[in-house]
Amino acid sequence: MALWGGRFTQAADQRFKQFNDSLRFDYRLAEQDIVGSVAWSKALVTVGVLTAEEQAQLEEALNVLLEDVRARPQQILESDAEDIHSWVEGKLIDKVGQLGKKLHTGRSRNDQVATDLKLWCKDTVSELLTANRQLQSVLVETAQNNQDAVMPGYTHLQRAQPVTFAHWCLAYVEMLARDESRLQDALKRLDVSPLGCGALAGTAYEIDREQLAGWLGFASATRNSLDSVSDRDHVLELLSAAAIGMVHLSRFAEDLIFFNTGEAGFVELSDRVTSGSSLMPQKKNPDALELIRGKCGRVQGALTGMMMTLKGLPLAYNKDMQEDKEGLFDALDTWLDCLHMAALVLDGIQVKRPRCQEAAQQGYANATELADYLVAKGVPFREAHHIVGEAVVEAIRQGKPLEDLPLDELQKFSPVIGEDVYPILSLQSCLDKRAAKGGVSPQQVAQAIAFAQARLG
């Protein structure tokens, strides 16, 4: 039975009911709805609506229902209830009779669903933070094991300067650390309870909303009832964090897809995260990574959709807000799945050090070192840049790396070049010289690994 039938003389059209009902997705708020109802029953005792005995009876029935839901959540979808609030109330009335009808006193589904959703968000943020930190830890471990794996660094997808696979891993640790910070920051703003704000104007019962917020694990209660029932900033913030986080994972996936190609050959992915072709027996496709990359788009879409849903809504609650859940649920589920999958990909990855080093020695990635060498000899950098460009053209013409050009040929481009140039052009020298904070030198990479390990515990 609907919770609002008294005003109406005709039953809802079945097509409208199917269009209007939300149980098929808000069933995921069942645990939060029950927990919120237990807290509300306690608040009703403080204002004399329920006796302590009645509250105890309601709480016992709600806790039984909670265990039942945890054991068999699919039962909810067997109902034709309008939403999760209707389902919980109906089940409660089945258990305790008329007493169950007293529970909704002073409460609206508007503040009820806002509370449920915030509780769900808090639970889910906790899961996301755990998965995020687990992926960071796997990246740090992978970096630790590959500090000596020299590979090309790229700009414009052209070989630029030598880096290490460890340095590449740590770049994504930095991105994930920012994602972690965004989640923690969003959690601070969503950690306020709207319960007790009623439909829009507040409850008529003198409930201590701060006490009620504490019972539910919130840091405090909201300060304005109109805002409280219509606020979905936390949905937007979490969708934004998810969108940014998925961009990071998509870039991670794209890098590894490229590194895994036959043309690059820097890594070998585990059989556990790849699949084959129904036609071509030799294929080993990076499906896990491609799906991470592909799923990024749906998360961006969820954020855009929610922005558009909210942009024109007047205060306070509107049924448009029912659209907040499906996109949020899907986006955060997707992000969580992709965090787990990225960690699984790294768990079995093999870095092909000889091939990485071979590629790093190609493409004149040490050209900047020659320019810096000239600067150290007193040549202005812009002039040094031009000189090295000419030397690279000659090396390309001869099909040689820079370090294989004889000294007399190098001196044609600048007489200040001496025998001491050759050690400077080695890969190890290229790495060692990048010793400023954040650089790719072995010392800086080791420090970055130690810092990340200490931060992650």
Swiss-Prot record:
Pathway assigned to this chain's UniProt record: Amino-acid biosynthesis; L-arginine biosynthesis; L-arginine from L-ornithine and carbamoyl phosphate: step 3/3
Entry annotated with the keyword Cytoplasm: yes
UniProt-listed Gene3D superfamilies: Fumarase/aspartase (C-terminal domain), Fumarase/aspartase (Central domain), Fumarase/aspartase (N-terminal domain)
Keywords: Amino-acid biosynthesis, Arginine biosynthesis, Cytoplasm, Lyase
Gene Ontology BP terms: arginine biosynthetic process via ornithine; L-arginine biosynthetic process
Keyword hit for Lyase: yes
GO cellular component: cytosol
CDD domains found in the cross-reference section: Argininosuccinate_lyase (cd01359)
Compartmental location: Cytoplasm
Catalytic reactions on record: 2-(N(omega)-L-arginino)succinate = fumarate + L-arginine
EC code: 4.3.2.1
SUPFAM superfamilies: L-aspartase-like
Family: Belongs to the lyase 1 family. Argininosuccinate lyase subfamily.
Record-linked PANTHER family: ARGININOSUCCINATE LYASE (PTHR43814:SF1)
Record-given protein name: Argininosuccinate lyase
Biological source species: Shigella dysenteriae serotype 1 (strain Sd197)
